[in-house]
Amino acid sequence: MAGKRDYYEILGVEKGADQDTIKKAYRKLAMQFHPDKNPGNKEAEEKFKEAAGAYEVLSDAQKRAQYDRFGHDAFTRGGGGGGFTDAEDIFSHFGDIFGDFFGGGMGGQQRQRRNRNEPRRGSDLRYVTEITLKDVITGIEKEIEFDTDKNCDECKGTGAEKGSQVSTCGTCGGSGQVVRQQGFFAMASTCPTCHGQGTVIKNPCKPCKGKGRVAEHRKIRLNIPAGVDTGTRLRVATEGEGGYMGGPPGDLYVEIRVKQHNNFERRNEDLFAELSLPYVQMLLGAEIEVPTVTGKAKLEVPKGTHHGDNVKLVGEGLPSLRGNRRGDIYFTVNVQFPEKLHKDEEKLLREIAKARGLNVTSEGGFFGKKK
């Protein structure tokens, strides 16, 4: 059995595509391969189901995060997601999307937009915050601020002034859509009277101007655990957009970005840095003090270290997000020569060269001429 195609490839979008781009790409494929437009075409039906399976995962923030990390394996061990058996299953799952194109008539089932007075969950929100490499080691509590919407307290989300009524739109009959027939297909568009809401407000609520929603500025404290990396997403339940008409709020997803450090390069839990050492310490070995992200530590340089060798400082890297280990720091050693030799140093080196049978320049050569 051939492996499953990449979901982003199926929809024809980049991996970093936003939800609007993903939704538009899926709509385009749904129109192209819809069974009503391709009666009896099994290949079109399979492509239709394939696109629906991809959209089911990529349109859900949690499922998409799992897929981005583990691929199809995220859903092969009871994880759920990405599977439809027939067209009716797809229609029931994505009725609101298809309704925009087919006037609610999908597979012989009449569908309507949600009533604005029906309780609905608020949307999920995305927030990006930046932390330092030191924060990755220690963890940090940060205060974040963002703007969102919630139900208007005055009208409780109805959009109507107290004591006035919300009536069903006479133009669309409450569906939020007007339908026109074009040959075999019934094509729908947003109702121009109620703008897709299905209801008409005669006396709008003044605080929210009839929208039923008001802006809200929110501050929350967020605990960022040690070991996170750029791209890590933290879910804060119920801190997203407020629900509609008493519905539950959405969630807040905070994406982490780690600032680049001046001295250290990160590779998973390990850190890498450059270290210049005098040739004598490299030859004879030494215990030296080196910088770390949070301070300083002692590093044992082995005897006979070569230029370009990596010397490891154990346990001074970054913690694992799961908390079961800590990485190391690798110092790439560069040989450091003195600008000028003292006479006794030069004498000793010449004696070493003579003992090893090495040909060197005469006295007053390279080091002797440098000022």
UniProtKB/Swiss-Prot annotation:
Zn(2+) 1 binds at residues 152, 155, 205, 208. The keyword Membrane does not apply. GO terms for cellular component: cytoplasm. It is found in: Cytoplasm. Zn(2+) 2 binds at residues 169, 172, 191, 194. Keywords: Chaperone, Cytoplasm, DNA replication, Metal-binding, Repeat, Stress response, Zinc, Zinc-finger. Belongs to the DnaJ family. This is Chaperone protein DnaJ. It comes from Bdellovibrio bacteriovorus (strain ATCC 15356 / DSM 50701 / NCIMB 9529 / HD100).
